Amino acid sequence: MERIVDILRNLESIPSPSGLSDRVISYIEDLAGTADIGTRRTNKGGLVVGNHSSPKLVISGHIDTLGAMVSGINSDGHLALAKIGGPILPSFEGEYVTIKTSSGREFRGTLLLNNPAAHVNQEAEKTVRKTDNMHIRLDAEVGKKEDTEKLGIRIGDFICFDPRFEYTDTGYIKSRFLDDKAGAAAMLDAMLALGHSGLRDLPVAFFFSNFEEVGHGASAGLPATALEMLVVDKGVVGEKVGGDESSVSIC
């Protein structure tokens, strides 16, 4: 159990919103190497893991997550944002973020409602949260657009939300992006089990896609010889569905 938790903790520590998956793919490549299992990157940057040249079964999950992107720099130096995937903004409000610039620099910040103080804005509680009325406040002394531009922040830079990973004493894991890093961790644990038990040459491949949250995760790159596909992803919990936090859903 500790191995799979460690793998999940490592996956969660590497930001990977759709379009920014190279580091987490490299981590998986290194992990596969410890079990003498080969890897192949797809043209889209996903990863096929397996030694068999003609796999019949593909086990697939995704390592990309929800996120955001800088869509503009406001006159006060705050950042406008566009969503990557479908984050529900009220659940992300107040979250700390890392802005990753194209030059490799990183800056911290917070996602906030415009005019967020309830003492000033009497409509703050009632306001529908959307990208048009929210912003990223940088942890940097900026007061105008030019100040932010001097930091090297540009439109198109990635905004990564903190995962807040926690493994509780009662055996629960709480974190953002368990969709689908929990699934990926389970796949990697199974991959290592096969590799270390001498079964690494079975006609099985693991496929880690990297654009699922924007709608085209496993649409390309699957081995052409695959006859069956097993997809590992989150199980939905909510009204009128059969899932719960302690069960595996098969559909």
Language model regions located:
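N-terminal hydrophobic/helix-forming segments and targeting peptides
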Residues: 1-251
